[in-house]
Amino acid sequence: MLSQEVLKKLEAIEQRFEELTALLSDPSVASNGDRFRKVSKERASLEPTVEALRAYRKLVTDIGDNEALLEEKDPDLREMAKEELAQLRPQVDPAEEQLKLYLVPKDPADEKDVILEIRAGAGGDEAGLFAAELLRMYLRYAERRGWRTEVADTSAGNLGGVKDVTVNIAGDSVYSWLKFESGVHRVQRVPATEAQGRIHTSTVTVAVMPEAEDIDIQVSPADIEMDVFRSTGSGGQSVNTTDSAVRLTHKPTGIIVKCQQEKSQLKNRNMAMRMLRAKLYEIELERQRSARDAARKSQVGTGDRSEKIRTYNFPQDRLTDHRINYTRHNLPAVMDGDVQDVIDACRTFYAAQALREASRGNAADGAAERRA
């Protein structure tokens, strides 16, 4: 059974959820667009926890009712209760674990939109083709979730592939869903250009960065060097007669970003600044994560982009996520954006890991207090 401490935390969340629900009916909130959106967003973030808590309560009540029926004299009622309990009792542990996961402290960046970068790695043209397929996979997944997507920059490759592409994705808690996609994605298959039928291995790097706002990252204009040039299309030919493309260099870090998707230089500059802030924000988040890891003296998997995270084996129609030992089949569906189960598995795995870390930290703090 859940401890009283856990139940109190869950009940506090439920109380806050009810307060927010009441606020949405308040005319002063409904007439204030910004506040209405803020309240709605917070309520939506709490709703899964509240629904799970209420389902758990019903489960516990149903078990209690059926256990009471075991004391009845009627043998049919007792048999029915046994059958019900055989179905209900196995649901308790998974339900309790799920509720505990909801109490894991949230990543402060989880609510943010993201900038997604996909880069072809080892494998030549085949890597470029797979990079294009991963782009389509993420765009289709975003479409399924109702997110908005905008391609910010693309470098075309051969045979319809891409060397690298940057996409802005906006919607509800995008980073919380996509953050574990960062890393090296490996593909194993027979390329269309392979005459001997040999299986080739290629790699593509995916980076998912939370989009930073001005309040998150302050960038001094003195630290920015801007170059303008003419936009180029596939093969390098100029597609614009004006210098509308923008390249920004952040002098303190050496980070370079470019944007040439828009015809307006101002729009390209604004887009490039969003990309730059996201990269700087990611560096700061990684610095904070490293500091926490060093303090705990433990390494928690974070989907680091240098980590080989996943293999797409086409001859065997199999996807394997190496971090969590997860396997599924039907790659055509995966490449069409049907990746929710993979993402859910990653979220559950890392949430459980974070919960264990938090529990160890709380235990250590308690021991220190007792010694004091």
Curated annotation (Swiss-Prot):
Q: Which SUPFAM superfamilies match?
A: Release factor
Organism, scientific name = Anaeromyxobacter sp. (strain Fw109-5)
Post-translational modification note: Methylated by PrmC. Methylation increases the termination efficiency of RF1.
| Compartments it resides in | Cytoplasm
The family note in this entry says: Belongs to the prokaryotic/mitochondrial release factor family.
State the HAMAP family in the record. Rel_fac_1
The cross-references to SMART domains, in alphabetical order and at most eight, read:
PCRF
Q: What does this protein do?
A: Peptide chain release factor 1 directs the termination of translation in response to the peptide chain termination codons UAG and UAA.
Q: What is this protein called?
A: Peptide chain release factor 1
One GO CC term, this protein: cytoplasm
Mention one GO molecular function.
translation release factor activity, codon specific
The record's keywords, sorted A to Z, are: Cytoplasm, Methylation, Protein biosynthesis
What PROSITE patterns does UniProt report for this protein, alphabetically?
Answer: RF_PROK_I (PS00745)
Q: Which residues carry this modification: N5-methylglutamine?
A: 237
